[in-house]
Swiss-Prot record:
Cellular component GO terms held in the UniProt record: plasma membrane
Keyword Cell membrane: yes
Gene3D superfamilies reported in the protein's UniProt record: Respiratory growth induced protein 1
Family, per entry: Belongs to the RGI1 family.
Subcellular compartments: Cell membrane
Keywords for the protein's UniProt record, in alphabetical order: Cell membrane, Membrane
Protein name per Swiss-Prot or TrEMBL: Respiratory growth induced protein 1
Topology relative to the membrane: Peripheral membrane protein
Leader peptide range in chain numbering: none
Organism domain of life: Eukaryota
Major localization class: membrane
Amino acid sequence: MSGKKKSKSDTVPLDLDNIKPLDHLQAVPKTRKMSMTSIESADEPGGFKEVLLPPTIKEFDELEQFEAFVRDETWDNDFDYFHGRLHYYPPFVLKECHDEIEKIKPTSNKNSSKFKRNLQHHIKKHLIKDLEKCCGYELNFDKAEEIESFDKLTWKFKDETDHGFSKEEEDKYDRHWKIELDITSHNDSALVDIDMKSIPIGH
């Protein structure tokens, strides 16, 4: 399931310096019930249980659009239930070629130690910090798991912490969630793929 959606980000420009943090949790939106489905229960033969469907995947090709989408999910009280994908040239690549895509060096890919170093810097010093502002709550990613094959290199980040909220507040509204962030670079292109999921825990 994937789709593009018109959202607040079409009318409200992204301003990373003026995003209001999420101070308090609220009840799960009533619309979440529409994302529930019944499946046969393995515990009770012939019985059924309610499960939450995976969130619809939203696709983006610009970093600012993607960050605005993450911000909007918090504004819409869906910070714990979204899935976004971004396919983009990182800012350091665009800066090096002066925004002329056809001038990107063919060596700008996961096999270049310079590209890899610049991408890691972009992720740690900019991307994750900016995504934290857009989320409106703390992101506490552990050291990324690094998976490399011949054609791609993926860093897998995961945050299963309380995101800066108290356990009591999370329990009160039943808002426990984890964030998964996968960042992939390829051996034949400077394009980078980001896959970010926020998923309720215990549903």
